[in-house]
Amino acid sequence: MKQNSSNKAIFALALSSFCMGVTEFIVAGILPDIAKYFQVTQPTAGWLVTIYAIGVVIGAPLLSIPLSPLNRKYQLLINLGIFALANLTIAISSNFYLSLFARVVAGFMHGVFFVIATIAAAKVAKKGKETQGIAIMVSGLTIALVTGVPLGTFVGQTFGFQAVFLLIFILTSIAFIAVFIIMPNHLHGSATKIKYLILALKVPPLLKCYIITICTCGGGFVLYTYIADLLLNISHFDKKMIGVILFLYGVCAIIGNLVGGRLTDLKGSIMSLRIILVGQAIIYALITLSAYSQTMVIINLCLMGFFAFGGISPLKTLTMISAQKYTPNFTDSSISINEGAFNVGIALASFVGGIVFARLGIVFNPIFAAIFVLPALLITLKSSRTI
């Protein structure tokens, strides 16, 4: 595939990834508006977040099965088409339960999208730059965190939350058209079955990949889920500064994601993860020590964003290579479990973080974040450097 066409295809995937990211993260910023519109409590409206995450975990492995025999291009078109319609449903719905249903459908599509897009990005990328291709695709997700969510929150609070989901529908439709025009037709899928999911879980090297993903991705969320409390009550920032600090965190997350992709192409996924995991553990521990210094906590949170998102591309690459090596006949199934593992890590880490916060206080959350990533570090230290 020509370099120019390759870049266009990857950026089409990045735009799709951006739409997925905004859809996942936006509800938290407009939750009061949604609750007021549907006349439900905020905890009830919060199910729009929970049900989406459940959809991602379930959708990644299970929906890979019916889509797997199709060409990658058509997999993406079906995926984006349903995702767009789910967001349009939320934009025009006046029924909370219909919106809840649309959210779980969108979550299903989110989960399976990153299975398809990870493979597609690696296939269309220039030889030797496969991981950078994956990193650029994933950057849509991190850009959504930095720009899409703040802008979406502003739009939702100004014009109503329906406007946000209408914009997501429009952007996803543009991504659909871009994929239809640009994505090559030669990216063939491989049929998969439920039994392949079970078999993948029985392969020790892949099981190690999933544990690494859960711990590496989850670690930061032991702290991040409750970061506002740390900044307000320990570091004593003004409430207006929270958005600025999280913006800086997101910018560093984008940089970390791109650097992680480049590092993986140069050093391999295992060596990259060793570097990133050591960085994560050190930074998490330093946040506890620096929590009372506003300057140092900002610096360390920026580094936290860098290392937290720096691990995404090597995690995806490690699993993709391992799946191709150990389960060549059902690669998609093995990769789909790893996509679910990302959200398992987030959910588990948030749960652990909540217990630590309630029992010991927020200042201990960074320490437990460091502990959370240690199993992943130990596994990578004992693994071959050749992957």
Where do the protein language model's features map onto the residues?
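Paired small-residue
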Residues: 11, 82, 86-89, 94-106, ...
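Helix-breaking motifs and short loop linkers at transmembrane-helix boundaries and internal kinks
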Residues: 39, 71, 92-98, 109, ...
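Conserved MFS/SLC helix-loop-helix module at the cytosolic interface between two early adjacent transmembrane helices
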Residues: 58-94
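Helix-to-loop junctions at the C-terminal end of transmembrane segments
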Residues: 60-72, 257-268, 357
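Helix-loop-helix hairpin linking two adjacent transmembrane segments in secondary transporters
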Residues: 94-98, 126-183, 213-216, 226-233, ...
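Cytoplasmic helix-loop-helix junction between adjacent transmembrane helices
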Residues: 102-140
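Intracellular juxtamembrane helix-capping segments at the cytosolic ends
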Residues: 113-125, 310-326
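A late C-terminal transmembrane helix in Major Facilitator Superfamily
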Residues: 322-359
